[in-house]
Amino acid sequence: EHDSHGELIYLIREYFNFTKDTTFLRSKNKNVIKAVEYIESLIAERSTDHFRNGNDSVRAYYGLVTESISHEGYSAKPMHSYWDNFFTMKGLKDAAEIQKILGEEESYQKIKKVRDTFKENLYNSLKLAMKVRDIDYIPGSVELGDFDATSTTIALTPCNEFNNLPKPEVYNTFDKYFEFFTNRRDDKIEWINYTPYENRLIGSYI
């Protein structure tokens, strides 16, 4: 599950946000650096000429982290999940900020470059995935173009990528979910399953 690497960095930064404990932050920076290095190794597997120079459906994978079962939603077959990639984006952003806080200029410049390149590739991937699947919402994964607002929601909170997400597709995503929610609430459709993961959407609507 490749969300974990970015989540580790995010957790370390979040602890610092509350405590302002720079001694703690410095003691964990080696873990931050190792997590970034591992993220780089995953990105490298999808940064080859095959993915760089392929058709749109192949280039949609370029520069992402590799496939995983992600948030357990792809346990039947690992996918290139945007859940993983948005947590990767969050981790790289926080890792860069941690270096600034600690005055580690060399590490900051290195991670900043990784972050900025990943950001460009992530949003290129989203555009290509939506184009290939002919969809007007943010997909859950590259392969499926699946609608999964309970996954996409983390792009807004805690990953804070709203300003960068393509419009109107991000609005369409949450409008589509809200319609599904109200139709269930009002007994307009037959349904069985409800997942508590849907609670994640509350932060995005707020």
What is the role of each PLM region?
Residues 1, 21, 25, 77-81, ...:
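Alpha-helix N-cap/helix-initiation motif
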Residues 14-17, 41, 45, 101, ...:
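Conserved helix-loop functional segments at active or binding sites
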Residues 1-7, 40-117:
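The feature captures the catalytic groove of carbohydrate-active enzymes
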Residues 8, 15, 64, 68-71, ...:
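Alpha-helical context
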Residues 5, 11-42:
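Hydrophobic or amphipathic alpha-helical targeting/insertion segments
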Residues 29-33, 37, 79-86, 90-97, ...:
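Active-site core of glycosidic bond-cleaving carbohydrate-active enzymes
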